[in-house]
Amino acid sequence: FNRVINGCWQLSAEHCLQGHLDYDDAIRAFHELVEQGFTTFDCADIYTGAEEVLGRFVMDLKGSGHYQEEDIQIHTKFVPDKDVLPVINMKYTEGIVDRSLKRMHREALDLVQFHWWDFDVPGMMETAFDLVKLQEKGKIHNIGMCNMDTNALKQMVDAGIPVVSNQAQYSVFDRRPERTLLDYSAEHGIYTFAYGTLAGGFLAER
């Protein structure tokens, strides 16, 4: 993956400033990014439309003959709905992963980043192990975490979940990861993927 990752949060209609997005413009922008060497994209199952537009982009690349599927890395997320947390099961988890595979026209997901809305709700570890089972089935290459604090990340590591990354908000304004998270992650070979580094455009618009 690249050290600079192309975030796709704003592809979601809910997050787009204009209220809608011209997907053709987005795909053209993706092509320009790849031509400049920025080949890693970050999205999520809950970014409405983001996985679909990345899927169209993947098909465009395949059709061009200039790139192989492995030349592009797509990181997605598994974010179970809050009301599902108390009753989540393997069927639900596999269904979401299968949907992401279909949307993005991939044989396997490069990285699935697991987010759990409320650490007080039981089921987080069981769901993480379900992702491991899907990895063993070949549907997921790598498992990462999203917005896990140090304690939650430690639970994953201690339980043997093969965590390769954790995405966390980190900027000159929000330096919470420096307390314990960055050091713990580094000690265990876990990459930290920072988002919000420009504070949503407050620090710089470009």
PLM ranges: what are they?
Residues 117-206:
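Beta/alpha (TIM)-barrel catalytic core signal, keyed to glycine-rich beta->alpha loops juxtaposed to Asp/Glu
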Residues 10-24, 78-94, 116-122:
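Active-site mouth loops of central-metabolism enzymes
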Residues 1-72, 136:
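N-terminal binding-site loop/beta-alpha segment at the start of enzyme catalytic domains
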Residues 6, 33, 41, 54, ...:
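Conserved, mostly hydrophobic/aromatic
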Residues 68-82, 112:
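A short, structured active-site edge motif that brings together acidic residues
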Residues 44-53, 81-86, 118-122, 171-176:
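Acidic-and-aromatic substrate-binding clefts and catalytic sites of carbohydrate-active enzymes
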Residues 101-123:
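Active-site groove signature of glycoside hydrolases
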Residues 19-33, 86-105, 149-155:
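Short, acidic/polar
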